[in-house]
Amino acid sequence: GITGELSWERIYLYGDTLKNIFGSIGNIPKEDKEIYLNAGYELTDIVGLSYLEMEYEEYLKGTKAKYLVNSDNTLTLIEEEQKGNDLVLSIDIDIQLKVEEIIKEKILLGDSYPNTDYYKDSYALISDPNTGNIIAISGLRRNDDGTWSDISLNTINKSFTIGSAVKGATIAVGYKYD
């Protein structure tokens, strides 16, 4: 007999950089089965399951080729497949990689200071003040075994206490005397 296997793999050009922000892909979740079937998907389709992959699924998915099976079991191409759209981000990958490098350096430097036993993670977000575009977004945690975890999602999913009440006043003065 003949067997077939469907497989897929997402390749991340920069390793774990922004991997969590991009999101994940996989099989259609059971709880969303009807939604996807009504939208023309097949149960074997791979879909975006989180973050950017899920948010922009309808633009990223593309379409499959369509064939006619002839009476002699040959195939006739009826409709070409269409590649999905590319999603262009405002992230500057060179700045992104530099920010990640700086975060790692600063966390490691923290070991040389007293009372930093709990300093295991840091976050950074750089945006263009004129457009609001995000240039770099990063969060890294140093694990107890010395490995690093990407926790970039915390920059948008976690709440933070402000560092100083004076900072708000400083910003307000800056606005007043622009």
Cite the ranges covered by each PLM segment.
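Small/polar-residue-rich segments within soluble enzyme cores
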Residues: 1-84
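Soluble periplasmic/extracytoplasmic beta-strand elements of cell-envelope proteins
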Residues: 3-5, 20-24, 88-90, 123-127, ...
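Generic detection of long, well-ordered alpha-helical segments
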Residues: 11, 46, 88-96
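Short pre-catalytic segments that frame enzyme active sites
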Residues: 31-36, 75-83, 93-166, 173-178
